Swiss-Prot record:
One of its GO terms (cellular component) is cytoplasm. InterPro entries: HemC, Porphobilin_deaminase_N, Porphobilinogen_deaminase_C, Porphobilinogen_deaminase_C_sf. PANTHER family: PORPHOBILINOGEN DEAMINASE (PTHR11557:SF0). Its cofactor is dipyrromethane. Gene3D superfamilies: Periplasmic binding protein-like II, Porphobilinogen deaminase, C-terminal domain. This is Porphobilinogen deaminase. Tetrapolymerization of the monopyrrole PBG into the hydroxymethylbilane pre-uroporphyrinogen in several discrete steps. It catalyses: 4 porphobilinogen + H2O = hydroxymethylbilane + 4 NH4(+). Keywords: Porphyrin biosynthesis, Transferase. Binds 1 dipyrromethane group covalently. The modification S-(dipyrrolylmethanemethyl)cysteine is found at C243. Pfam families: Porphobil_deam (PF01379), Porphobil_deamC (PF03900). Its EC number is 2.5.1.61.
Length: 305
């Protein structure tokens, strides 16, 4: 048995930080194994200035990495779960979901804001996410959404270089990179914007038939996180979700039970349909909520009208 394991990762600061966190957890359990990172450049990395919806949605950050897994050049890969397509290649599996951190978004600004109402009329907000855009505009239709891409440092700089009143970021990325936000104000958006499916959770992908790696990954799987994100992904699968229209989905534990919130919206914020606090301890809830939202969609949200 070889004592070396090759781990696939994107090259960005956040991707590397997440991969190193996973490796550190495994090294504590398997001190005799040498973990080596292999960086893989994805379509999403190459096309930094084009919206994700235009270059293929979620899969643009994982396809090349999955190709390496299928070719056997890496043993497993660490992804942000929200980047992973709802249906995997037949020979691959998500082998572990480490404990989830915050799934929520936040608004980072130079202004001291206590709520979204404190933003000036017509404020310029940077985000490249249709999910964030649709929900934000449903609350403040006067806001001007400015598409921005790039790593977290790049996006923070754009607050000044593009005269933005704020940008929306995932709390998880800020936490994992330990970003210094002392010169900014941060508004928690938990009560305003439903998270993306899988946000705040890492996913470790491997070959379905690689029993050695799968047993290894079992050791760092968090059962509650795994259950919750599987409910969310079932919801997304039923909706055919990528990045082409706003979808929010969040399963969470509260008072001893699992609850699920699901949402679809139009990109302009005119229509928002959601179900919240749906008990999700039994299987099939993700599909059920998706079907309920589809039945209520009289506005052509899913068709992209």
């Amino acid at each position: 048995m070889t004592n070396k394991v090759i781990v696939g990762s994107r090259k960005s600061k956040l991707a590397m930080a997440q991969t190193e966190l996973v490796i550190a957890s495994l090294e504590k359990i398997f001190p005799d194994i040498k973990f080596e990172i292999k960086n893989v450049i994805t379509e999403g990395d190459r096309n930094r200035h084009v919206s994700l919806a235009k270059i293929g949605g979620k899969g643009v950050f994982v396809k090349e990495i999955e190709d390496e897994l299928k070719d056997g050049t890496i043993d497993f890969a660490v992804h942000s779960l929200k980047d992973v397509m709802p249906i995997l290649p037949e020979e691959l599996v998500l082998g572990a979901f480490p404990k989830r951190v915050s799934p929520y978004d936040c608004l980072v600004s130079r202004k001291n804001l206590s709520s979204l109402n404190d933003l000036p009329k017509g404020a310029r907000i940077g985000t490249n996410s249709l999910r964030r855009q649709g929900q934000l505009l449903s609350i403040r239709p006067d806001l001007k959404i400015i598409p921005i891409r790039g790593n977290i440092d790049t996006r923070l700089r754009k607050i000044d270089t593009e005269a933005l009143d704020g940008i929306i970021l995932a709390e998880a990325g800020l936490t994992r990179l330990n970003i210094d936000l002392s010169s900014y104000h941060v508004l928690d958006l938990q009560n305003y914007i439903m998270p993306a499916v899988g946000q705040g959770c890492l996913a470790i992908e491997c070959r379905k038939n690689d029993t050695r790696i799968r047993k290894m990954l079992d050791q760092i799987n968090d059962e509650e996180s795994a259950y919750c994100v599987q409910v969310e992904r079932e919801f997304m699968r039923e909706l055919g979700g990528s990045c082409n229209f706003p979808i929010g989905g969040h399963a969470y534990a509260k008072n001893g039970q699992i609850l699920f919130d699901g949402l679809i919206a139009s990109p302009n914020g005119e229509h928002v349909i959601k179900e919240t606090k749906i008990p999700a301890n039994n299987s099939g809830v993700g599909k059920k909520v998706a079907d309920q939202l589809l039945a209520k969609d009289k506005f052509g949200i899913i068709e992209g009208e």
